[in-house]
């Protein structure tokens, strides 16, 4: 659902920012430290309940304030906009509201406001640990399969309990086997959802990458976390003695990974930084496109667009995002790096950010 209105209070240097974004393209220009990225951070916070810049909530709550607040109105095809809000307290408490009523969890916001982030740290999707790529897959599986989150939570709980049991030591194989039934059932469900999602994502990724560049041939390979020739029950049974020795569960969905390959090896090892940026951008856009094809509009956040992409690829990236008919927020230090030829029918709004103050520079459809 596109953001119709956004109110931000006490997020970093944004004491009070209120504005009505375009349902299509929003460009925010400002110097480093001006607060432009904090606008994207606030939108991300409203969707995920956490920042993409820091895991420590106290770092983004404005100094001398007890909490930060992000409020938005979300467009609906029928009826009045939905009012959603999130308040993050300095003590860590999160208060989520939808239509004025307290929500049970941030997940209810994530369902209503899917957000995709493309920023300089997106390289971590290739460079980082498998856990980052699992998060990438799980975000998609969450939106693709309505039963995924319940299975994932149950499996995580069973895995944690099993590892606690293993750390205590002196456990028999028969007791562990009895305990493993729920772990295996839920783990297989999580694995099947992940596998199905990657299969759906792959052709979208290949197509998007080809639109960004014709110079790369990249494939996606899903590793489920154990031998593909075995089911999870067989893998867990074969590994019980080793698990007892190690004191933790060494095989299963918690070891899953998304392997990004070129013809000559891992994409991380064979591609330049600029090419890696294109691959990661294609992965993110493909995820969004798949969601849009399901009738689920989402918001793209593109922070520091010029970073590591030349003007030609920046133009292609923006044209591709524009073609998805999604709401887009783009930040840049220099105005000329986002001075593209948008479609005549695209509502582009340009904002300037100075010391936490946001001002509208231009609004409306592009001139012919």
From Swiss-Prot:
One of its GO terms (biological process) is SOS response. InterPro entries: DNA-binding_RecF, DNA-binding_RecF_CS, P-loop_NTPase, RecF/RecN/SMC_N, RecF_2. It is found in: Cytoplasm. GO terms for molecular function: ATP binding; single-stranded DNA binding. The RecF protein is involved in DNA metabolism; it is required for DNA replication and normal SOS inducibility. RecF binds preferentially to single-stranded, linear DNA. It also seems to bind ATP. PANTHER family: DNA REPLICATION AND REPAIR PROTEIN RECF. This is DNA replication and repair protein RecF. It comes from Marinomonas sp. (strain MWYL1).
């Amino acid at each position: 659902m596109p953001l119709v209105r956004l109110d931000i209070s006490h997020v970093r240097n944004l004491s009070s920012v209120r504005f009505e974004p375009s349902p299509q393209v929003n460009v925010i220009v400002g110097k480093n430290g001006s607060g432009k990225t904090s606008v994207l951070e606030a939108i991300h916070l409203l969707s995920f309940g956490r920042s993409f810049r820091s895991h420590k909530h106290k770092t983004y709550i404005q100094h001398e304030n007890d909490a930060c607040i992000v409020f938005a109105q979300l467009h609906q095809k029928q009826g009045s906009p939905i009012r959603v809000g999130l308040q993050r307290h300095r003590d860590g408490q999160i208060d989520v509201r939808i239509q004025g009523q307290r929500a049970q969890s941030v997940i209810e916001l994530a369902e209503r406001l899917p957000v995709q982030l493309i920023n300089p740290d997106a390289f971590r999707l290739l460079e980082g640990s498998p856990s980052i790529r699992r998060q990438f897959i799980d975000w998609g599986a969450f939106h693709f399969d309505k039963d995924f989150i319940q299975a994932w939570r149950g499996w995580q709980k069973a895995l944690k309990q099993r590892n606690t049991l293993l750390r205590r030591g002196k456990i028999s194989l028969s007791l562990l086997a009895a305990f493993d039934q729920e772990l295996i059932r839920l783990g297989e469900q999580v694995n099947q959802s992940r596998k199905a999602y990657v299969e759906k994502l792959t052709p979208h990724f290949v197509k998007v990458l080809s639109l960004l560049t014709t110079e790369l041939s990249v494939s996606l390979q899903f590793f489920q976390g154990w031998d593909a020739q075995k089911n999870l029950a067989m893998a867990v049974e074969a590994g019980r003695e080793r698990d007892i020795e190690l004191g933790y569960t060494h095989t299963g969905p918690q070891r899953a990974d998304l392997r990004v390959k070129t013809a000559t090896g891992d994409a991380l090892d064979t591609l330049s930084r600029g090419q890696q940026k294109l691959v990661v951008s294609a992965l993110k856009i493909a995820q969004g496109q798949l969601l849009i094809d399901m009738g689920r509009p989402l918001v793209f956040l593109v922070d520091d667009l010029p970073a590591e992409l030349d003007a030609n690829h920046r133009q292609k990236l923006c044209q591709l995002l524009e073609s998805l008919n999604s709401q887009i927020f783009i930040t840049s230090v220099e105005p000329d790096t986002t001075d593209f030829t948008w479609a005549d029918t695209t509502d582009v709004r340009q904002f300037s950010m100075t010391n936490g103050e946001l001002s509208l520079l231009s609004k409306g459809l592009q001139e012919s």
